[in-house]
Amino acid sequence: MPDIRVEVVYALPERQYLRTVSLVVGSTVEDAIKASGLLELRPDIDLEKNKVGIYSRPVKLGDKLNDGDRVEIYRPLIADPKELRRQRAEQAKK
């Protein structure tokens, strides 16, 4: 069976991780993340909590991959985006 090549990325404010992996056709997002080794390298990644996407489009761990996809592991939000916008608007008024 032919292989597909995908990238798996995880970004922190101080460091970015990019791993290219070769997988069999029909592999899933979860397969790529496990093959990348990022789960062992970054114990803070919890696939039950962290959302994932392909090229900024949210996907599920069981979704199939295509050759050339970029799997992105997203960090949980620390603050509520609405609250941050409200605070910035108040700051701008001053």
Swiss-Prot record:
Disulfide linkage: none
Query: Which species is listed as the source?
Result: Yersinia pseudotuberculosis serotype O:1b (strain IP 31758)
User: Organism's domain of life?
Assistant: Bacteria
The protein here is known as: Protein RnfH
Q: Which family does it belong to?
A: Belongs to the UPF0125 (RnfH) family.
Q: Which InterPro entries match?
A: Mopterin_synth/thiamin_S_b, RnfH, RnfH_sf
Spell out the Pfam families in the cross-references: Ub-RnfH
